[in-house]
A protein has these predicted regions:
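N-terminal pre-Walker A segment at the start of P-loop NTPase domains
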Residues: 1-10, 221-242
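Glycine-rich P-loop/Walker A and Walker A-like loops and their local beta1-loop-alpha1 context
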Residues: 11, 18-49, 235-275
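Conserved inter-motif catalytic segment of the P-loop NTP-binding fold
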Residues: 50-129, 275
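P-loop NTPase motor core
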Residues: 100-171, 175
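Charged, amphipathic alpha-helical linker segments immediately N-terminal to NTP-binding catalytic cores
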Residues: 197-232
Length: 275
């Protein structure tokens, strides 16, 4: 069985095992980080020796490579090793020509395929219900055809969180919704794990950032069953404190309450506990 990774530690833990055939839908507002996440998944699996194909209808290759290089994703390097290929398909093509070209590319032995974005393709056939249904069915079956990981990127209008791609939400294995908003004059990024087939969703939403030379970092809160066992016993040197609480252990969480007018309140308590 082919196994894949997301390439982001926090997400790998939430999603669990990714076994082919597998489909991930990445949806989000413009600028939310969809292309960055799709590229991260590609890059992480290419480093494991899996061939990745990135099909784009918008992105410029040089611009994408340059931006990802700043995030620590060396796409040129894996391209030179034959593990990454970027193909831009202009929307001026007829939809049948685009699918024919995708079919030819799929036959070249790729394990990971990104389509950025499926929204653009569906927009072309918006008025043709039968063609739209046929196109969606094609992408349903695609990961089975090449027995690998398919990553679909979808655009969400600002202010909306509904994907609006029809039944595709029911057949994909994982759905990530990327969001961003302004809080206290700062940009806050959130990732919602809306669906992960075969894994319980213990944490549905987490903060993340996109850092230079690092890429995507997801800040997942601890899951209750993963809280470590109590550490070694500690006995406070302060006799008064010792008489009140006895002892405590490394890893304990201690709530300290004191009146605001107490002299050296917080500093004094921290000094006592640190001994």
């Amino acid at each position: 069985m082919k196994r894949f990774v997301i390439g982001v530690p926090g997400l790998d833990k939430l999603v669990g095992e990714v076994v082919a055939p597998y489909t991930i839908l990445i949806a989000g507002h413009p600028g939310a980080g969809k292309t960055t996440l799709a590229s991260t998944i590609c890059y992480a699996n290419a480093l494991k020796g899996e061939k990745c194909l990135y099909i784009s209808l918008y992105e410029d290759k040089e611009k994408l490579f340059r931006y990802m290089e700043r995030l620590g994703l060396k796409l040129r390097e894996i391209e030179s090793n034959g593990l990454f290929r970027f193909v831009k398909l202009p929307l001026t093509f007829d939809i049948n020509m685009i699918i024919d070209e995708v079919g030819k590319l799929v036959g070249e032995g790729y394990s990971v395929i990104v389509v950025d974005s499926i929204t653009a393709l569906l927009e072309v056939v918006r008025e043709n219900v039968e063609k739209r249904a046929w196109l969606l069915n094609y992408f349903y079956q695609l990961p089975v055809l090449f027995n690998g990981l398919l990553i679909l990127v979808s655009e969400l209008p600002f202010g909306e969180e509904r994907i609006g791609l029809g039944s595709i939400e029911f057949v994909v294995d994982s759905i990530f919704i990327l969001k961003h908003r302004i809080e206290d004059h700062l940009l806050t990024r959130l990732i919602e794990v809306r669906k992960t087939r075969g894994s319980p969703i213990n944490i549905a939403e987490a903060y993340f950032t996109i850092a230079e030379n690092i890429g995507i970092v997801v800040f997942t809160p601890p899951i209750l069953q993963e809280i470590p066992h109590e550490g070694e016993e500690l006995v406070p040197i302060c006799n008064a404190l010792k008489n009140v609480i006895g002892h405590f252990h490394k890893g304990f969480i201690i709530n300290v309450f004191f009146p605001p007018e107490a002299p050296m309140g917080r500093e004094a308590i921290l000094a006592i506990l640190s001994t």
